[in-house]
Curated annotation (Swiss-Prot):
GO terms for molecular function: GTP binding. InterPro entries: G_CP_dom, Mito_lipid_metab_GTPase, P-loop_NTPase. This is Genetic interactor of prohibitins 3, mitochondrial. Belongs to the TRAFAC class YlqF/YawG GTPase family. GEP3 subfamily. Its main location: mitochondrion. One of its GO terms (cellular component) is mitochondrion. It is found in: Mitochondrion. SUPFAM superfamilies: P-loop containing nucleoside triphosphate hydrolases (SSF52540). Keywords: Mitochondrion, Transit peptide. PROSITE patterns: G_CP. Residues 1-24 form a transit peptide. May be involved in the mitochondrial lipid metabolism. Residues 118-299 form the CP-type G domain. It comes from Vanderwaltozyma polyspora (strain ATCC 22028 / DSM 70294 / BCRC 21397 / CBS 2163 / NBRC 10782 / NRRL Y-8283 / UCD 57-17).
Length: 551
């Protein structure tokens, strides 16, 4: 439970963050203290070699320098810069070898980026300092920690990557906060003090965020939700600096050639690799101090995606700047018709969506990678398996995003999706989401299934942007009398993992629903109704039969 933050954690091992380590003694990317003696230990770096005037006359002469401190420095030297200028240059920030290999070459061992528990991370936060919860909007409800929100007196929740869900920046400061305040109030019983959304990439709502942050706020969230990227956007927008940066350097000491380099030295370490940040790092942004904490994991032993997904695919998925925001506005779709043989839709093998027979469906993907439709899951995995071990490129190689080991049906779990009407969004933790729309005249043809590699979490939700937009219209037209969030039905749900040989999935899903809600009788819905009658008829309001999500 998160409640240990203010008491047990600090009684057992109170380690308040200190900015006493000088900025040149810590890796500018991950924050680890640097050392140059033992390459096998964390924090190892090679000291940059000084340029010697008289011995080196051109930039080509210094390209013998092999480590990134020097390579990056060479790249940043502008044409016309003399060696004397470079010699007198303000010292640049340093990076450890682990981060250099990971950031610049995409070479890393996941064991060097181990998960941290919430208990470990929270030790860096003094008792009286405000926490800002950071979560990824495209992956809601994943990354939202109910325990943190209910244990903070002035809770602040910031959703990142809003441009991957919302069409316009105005929704981040108006429609979304109203919707989520009502959502947490009526569905979780929480009074969240402030809810905001931002887009670091498009610079949406940064001023609104900064004005709502208290001094000495700590950014807390899971790995790769965008904490460090958000910090960098604030630094760039408001000329922020790292704490402990040499304050004796004044503007008149910095020439134009050095200014760009100086600004770059202030930025937080950002990468598509989870757990890059290893130590709490502080920044001065405008008149406020803000701290970037390492990401924490609910399960420190969870399987890293690197074991499942090919490195180039994982890089596409994780790099926010590669996301095509045109999809949010235009929503291009692929049509798939369900068959008796189990026709399925996939993006790289990250999942296989299997619609029920005779259903006609549209899929809009918000995940990078080429989609493909296979005859069935078994055939798909056989095809992906044949991609490996061939001397010549396989014609379907570009559609395979999983490692060789995962081209095996036993590595997958069968998720059954509870009944829905119209459209839903299927969310994959740390990957993204797709929109699934059932088209044509409504009829219940059976339950949808999605086969997902073991270790990847999945849930469903009603389309988020539609909920926010329609809720806001209802809220304003009623002059704030009607909630912007529907109260009478669940809006998110877990899937139901079943045995591959289970035939009566509809009866099994009811059994599993009753089991899941055994200690939450008050949330049970429609259990006295005839389930077949509920799903056989189209309703004005989606009944969302057997929807349930455990926060």
């Amino acid at each position: 439970m998160f409640v240990v933050r203010r008491s047990i954690v600090f009684q057992q091992s109170r380690r308040q963050f200190s900015g006493s380590i000088a900025w040149l003694q810590a890796c500018s990317s991950c924050g680890i203290k640097l050392q140059s003696k033992n390459p096998a230990l964390i924090g190892y770096y090679t000291k940059p070699k000084p340029l010697e005037v008289g011995k080196v006359e051109t930039l080509e002469d210094v390209k013998y320098m092999l480590f990134s401190q020097d390579i990056q420095k060479i790249k940043e030297i502008e044409d016309g810069t003399t060696l004397e200028d470079e010699k007198n240059r303000i010292p640049h920030s340093l990076i450890c070898k682990r981060c250099s290999d990971a950031v610049h070459q995409n070479k890393y061992d996941v064991m060097d980026f181990k998960n941290c528990s919430l208990k470990e991370v929270i030790r860096s936060v003094p008792n009286d300092k405000p926490i800002v919860s950071i979560a990824s909007l495209p992956e809601f409800p994943f990354h939202v920690n109910k325990n943190i929100l209910e244990n903070e007196k002035e809770s602040v929740l910031v959703f990142t990557k809003a441009d991957q869900v919302l069409k316009t920046s105005s929704a981040t400061s108006t429609r979304l906060p109203i919707f989520f305040k009502d959502y947490f109030k009526y569905h979780l019983g929480l009074q969240v003090n402030k809810v905001l959304a931002v887009s670091s990439l498009k610079k949406w709502n940064l001023s609104g965020l900064l004005s709502n942050l208290r001094n000495n706020s700590y950014f807390l969230g899971n790995p790769n939700v965008g904490k460090s990227t958000l910090m960098n956007s604030l630094i760039q927008r408001y000329n922020g600096t790292k704490l402990d940066f040499n304050s004796n350097i004044s503007d008149d000491m910095v020439n134009d050639a050095q200014h760009k380099h100086l600004r770059k030295a202030q930025l937080a370490g950002v990468s598509h690799i989870p757990n890059l940040t290893r130590e709490c790092q502080g920044y001065q942004v405008d008149k406020k101090r803000i701290y970037d904490l390492p990401g924490y994991s609910e399960n420190v032993d969870e399987l890293p995606l690197e074991r499942i997904v090919k490195s180039n695919w994982l890089e596409w998925v994780r790099k926010t700047n590669l996301f095509d925001t045109k999809k949010v506005k235009k929503k291009p779709y692929i049509t798939i018709k369900g068959t008796e043989n189990g026709r399925c839709y996939t993006i790289g093998g990250l999942f296989f969506l299997q619609p029920p027979p005779y259903s006609i469906n549209q899929i809009i993907k918000f995940i990078p990678g080429e989609p493909y439709i296979f005859k069935n899951v078994t055939r798909a995995l056989e095809t992906f398996k044949s991609v490996y071990g061939n001397d010549t490129p396989h014609p379907l190689e570009k559609y395979c995003g999983i490692n060789d080991e995962y081209c095996d049906i036993t590595k997958y779990q069968r998720h059954v999706i509870p009944p829905f009407q119209g459209s839903i969004e299927i969310v994959f933790k740390d990957i993204g989401y797709i929109l699934l729309r059932s088209t044509g005249r409504y009829s219940f043809n059976g339950l949808y299934e999605i086969w997902v590699p073991k270790g990847i979490s999945v849930c469903i939700r009603e389309p988020l942007e539609k909920l926010i937009e329609e809720g806001y219209v209802q809220y304003t037209e009623s002059k704030n009398k009607i909630s912007s969030c529907p109260k009478g039905r669940p809006l998110v749900s877990s899937t139901y993992i079943m045995d591959p040989n289970e035939e009566d999935t509809f009866a099994k899903i009811r059994e599993m629903y009753l089991d899941r809600t055994e200690n939450e009788i008050s949330v049970r819905r429609l259990v006295k109704e005839d389930p077949l009658e509920v799903v056989s008829n189209k309703h004005d309001t989606p009944p969302n039969l057997y929807w349930h999500y455990k926060w």
